UniProtKB/Swiss-Prot annotation:
Gene: TMLHE
Function according to Swiss-Prot or TrEMBL: Converts trimethyllysine (TML) into hydroxytrimethyllysine (HTML).
Organism, as annotated: Homo sapiens
Subunit structure: Homodimer.
Disease listed for this protein: Autism, X-linked 6: A form of autism, a complex multifactorial, pervasive developmental disorder characterized by impairments in reciprocal social interaction and communication, restricted and stereotyped patterns of interests and activities, and the presence of developmental abnormalities by 3 years of age. Most individuals with autism also manifest moderate intellectual disability. AUTSX6 patients may respond favorably to carnitine supplementation.
Subcellular location as annotated: Mitochondrion matrix
One GO cellular component, as annotated: mitochondrion
Protein name (Swiss-Prot/TrEMBL): Trimethyllysine dioxygenase, mitochondrial
Amino acid sequence: MWYHRLSHLHSRLQDLLKGGVIYPALPQPNFKSLLPLAVHWHHTASKSLTCAWQQHEDHFELKYANTVMRFDYVWLRDHCRSASCYNSKTHQRSLDTASVDLCIKPKTIRLDETTLFFTWPDGHVTKYDLNWLVKNSYEGQKQKVIQPRILWNAEIYQQAQVPSVDCQSFLETNEGLKKFLQNFLLYGIAFVENVPPTQEHTEKLAERISLIRETIYGRMWYFTSDFSRGDTAYTKLALDRHTDTTYFQEPCGIQVFHCLKHEGTGGRTLLVDGFYAAEQVLQKAPEEFELLSKVPLKHEYIEDVGECHNHMIGIGPVLNIYPWNKELYLIRYNNYDRAVINTVPYDVVHRWYTAHRTLTIELRRPENEFWVKLKPGRVLFIDNWRVLHGRECFTGYRQLCGCYLTRDDVLNTARLLGLQA
């Protein structure tokens, strides 16, 4: 499973937001009794946990905190946190990794309470806290999500009654900002209310959490239905669900929308949790989910309108997952901007179309559609790596402004406020 269904884990939500997955302190079985006599395991016991470890020819094996871990000896030497190997003030490695013997093995290993000591052939001593090894081992990372999320359809989101944050609280207090970011990280969308309906105030709001990402559309964009750019967004037509800037090699992470004025009808905004839809595909057709996560596609944006001349190309699969824990972190879905499919062999193309159709059916289910009317004073933030957006057609004069934010900076702000991101 590539995510935690937090809607069933409300009692652990605060722990997840502060520090990730909580590993229970369960006693370990007697591994020694399960192994041939020729294998020698070292055992220690604390008040709550037992530890067993063995030195192999090419790696070190550790059983602790309900986790079986294996560490390459070069890895253990490379990650030494001694003063000569790691600068704790700058949090940067001082050791020259290329200087480590690729055949290195420790001369001795000993355990003192919950600290392992490795003595290397040159006499250097590396020490590791057992909990640090659990947290940073490959096996430990497989059990941990990078970012906790609550997946939703329209009913789930509406029943959650996720509160908006007032503009003044957002701008002037860390409490308001943290509340906003917590909602945004969990659901992929969040609202700020009572914002003065101007481009300048919208910009000030965005800069509270991130640097604004300047693109071919400028720093802050402001548009009506005048088709001033070669994009369907600059019309009154309906837009099907999609993610933006799929034609960038790294799509923009967050987008901000503020409707400054609308003198007419229609124009509601459509929001769909792409991760919820992808989870349905994973449950119903796992082989199709896997195909969508492996086949790279081109998306492109060709513009030749007035003084705007651009040809952007981005390449990547529809679904992007972390390989070690299978956590989905990015959906790249835009049928408007998908380029010619020439990166897929003929014997895979039809299977890809089938998988794409399965995902599209889930994305288009009416129960997955959350519709909202944007209005002056209400600013919408969207996780463009997760939530698809669209709109219904509209009449009359409509002004929107907004921008893209750098994802790294938004997540940086969240971490500095103590959130898991």
